[in-house]
Amino acid sequence: MQRGIVWVVDDDSSIRWVLERALAGAGLTCTTFENGAEVLEALASKTPDVLLSDIRMPGMDGLALLKQIKQRHPMLPVIIMTAHSDLDAAVSAYQQGAFDYLPKPFDIDEAVALVERAISHYQEQQQPRNVQLNGPTTDIIGEAPAMQDVFRIIGRLSRSSISVLINGESGTGKELVAHALHRHSPRAKAPFIALNMAAIPKDLIESELFGHEKGAFTGANTIRQGRFEQADGGTLFLDEIGDMPLDVQTRLLRVLADGQFYRVGGYAPVKVDVRIIAATHQNLEQRVQEGKFREDLFHRLNVIRVHLPPLRERREDIPRLARHFLQVAARELGVEAKLLHPETEAALTRLAWPGNVRQLENTCRWLTVMAAGQEVLIQDLPGELFESTVAESTSQMQPDSWATLLAQWADRALRSGHQNLLSEAQPELERTLLTTALRHTQGHKQEAARLLGWGRNTLTRKLKELGME
């Protein structure tokens, strides 16, 4: 690959400076621009190998610039940069033909590697895709790197109808991602039908999926369409697919292979065109090894895998998510949105959140109703949040260990709004150790100092500081 020519457009001079030097250091020729109008003017006489553009700029923004570039130079790869990391920005960039999406703050080495990949792509004369779809906004929020990967996958699948398997713990937002995949796909105007395998009695799953004929079983008084027929032309979301019985897995596999099925009690085949998005919190590979999930069905579903991280692995997103959920809850209840005190925001970020995003959302609803003031303080938070965090942090400890008791004390103190816990705890810890050591040595100070790992002078000073002389 020949060394390439890179143009950078950003109204932030510091970003231009950093990228210009990093790209020059990689042997690339870099020219910077302050706004989109300057880029379009320069494009009238020459063309780079790749363009990096900020998305939020005065005047012409990055998406408007991208649209004009794709009309004039459809083969030119454009990388969109933004500090506003959300799904709609990523999808809009991909749908309008962006080569890739680079959220700020970015790792400079990764940015250079992405530019070099785009140059290679351009020099190989590969035509990038250009799709004009403007899907509705969603409630998927995330600036964490793992969520940016999810946004990229949704953007890259915006012209596709292939099967997707979503993995993630309960409450991580798997159905939201499934909705987003549907909304940003060619099937967006067709139905999106969801079915949770774990919520349906096993003997009713076949009827729910495939429908039934009149008289197929006791109580089947009319013909009933199943979820496959309801989703014809659109998307069928099968949540908790790992709980699907093996016999139903066999029928599902046939539908995926043939595009047709029989209603329960029926003899005429029903043809459908349905995209399958499946989700699970289980390890399907392990279920396959245990003989509880068909391997051939697993491979049919696992064309594209999307992993949703638990909330504890994307703590930087918690404040923004909490503010969003407080605003949503306020709109639902017709009240003014609560505000988070900075200490409360920090406390939320430290919590365990075993229920993930769903638990955070429910907590924000609870706070909207139950918090006394307009500003949410630490003492307004429900106690079970701290109990679950303490339980998680002490799960590896003995139930009667001093560390467990210390963790429980710290939990109570934080809930009461205490600060500077170390300055409060350390004197008590030293007083307890001194008292115990002196009792053990029948008041012999030199021996007590030895047991504590102190010199005699240190012990004497500590006794004085703690008022124990």
Swiss-Prot record:
InterPro entries: AAA+_ATPase, CheY-like_superfamily, Homeodomain-like_sf, HTH_Fis, P-loop_NTPase, Sig_transdc_resp-reg_receiver, Sigma_54_int, Sigma_54_int_dom_ATP-bd_1
Binding site for ATP: 168-175, 231-240
CDD domains: AAA, REC_NtrC
Residues with the 4-aspartylphosphate modification: D54
Stretches assigned to the Response regulatory domain: 5-119
NCBIfam families per the UniProt record, alphabetical: ntrC, PRK10923.1
Name assigned to this protein: DNA-binding transcriptional regulator NtrC
